[in-house]
Amino acid sequence: MLTLTLTPLEWEALTLSLRVALWSMAVSLPPALAVAWVLARCRFPGRTLLDGLVHLPLILPPVVTGYVLLLLLGTRGPVGAWLNETFGIVFAFRWTGAVVAAAVMGFPLMVRAIRLSIEAVDSRLEAAAGTLGASPPLVFLTVTLPLILPGIVAGAILAFAKGMGEFGATITFVSNIPGETRTLPIAIYTLLQVPGGETAAARLTGIAIALSMLALVGSELLARHISRRIRGLDAVR
């Protein structure tokens, strides 16, 4: 019979995954919003290249992405060595490195969701606000942002779910250290290598599925609620 009682190591893996997913979502949101805006509204040489680079983690094997992160941000890498010597910041084999890996893997999903929302905005609404004297920042805050909020929510939740399930890039970049970098997927993988670990792996698998479904369903419901509120405000106006 499957028991839902988790061992301390399993709780560590679960809480670490939640922390990594939340942090990766938070640190990805500002740059994702900026990049999505640039890709949706700006025309410049190299735009296609930027779009390709943003979506590259979706195409590359996650292990390759993790290895590139290790080459760049490892203690001997050009960026990692500089961060370590200058600020004492180390990402490789730390939980913060797992945040970086999850953020990189979830970034394209967030950018795409926000970009589609920006492209769907009727530019005439923004132009009308501008003719009424609103500055560009005010137009963005009062007109554009409320309209693209469902896309932001959807992108953030997708990035969170991706962070919860990230495995290949994480284990390549930060390894499998109990209590430090052993996230939920890595814990499941580890348990499957141990005789008799199938029951614990099944528990964690069920939890991972439940959390992912909860995030996706919650995202859909929240996006619908925001859309209804926006339509209601438009009707009042």
What feature does the model see in each segment?
Residues 1-26, 38-44, 84-88, 190-199:
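Periplasmic/extracellular loop-to-transmembrane helix junction in inner-membrane transport proteins
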Residues 1-9, 173-213, 218, 237:
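Interhelical loop and adjacent transmembrane-helix boundary motif
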Residues 2-3, 66-103, 173-178:
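Membrane-interfacial helix termini and adjacent extracytoplasmic/periplasmic loops
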Residues 21, 25-33, 37, 63, ...:
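Hydrophobic positions within alpha-helical transmembrane segments of bacterial inner-membrane proteins
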Residues 23-54, 67-69, 117-119, 124-125, ...:
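Transmembrane-helix boundary motif in ABC transporter permease subunits
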Residues 46, 108, 112-126, 130-131, ...:
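C-terminal transmembrane helix and the adjacent membrane-cytosol boundary/short C-terminal tail
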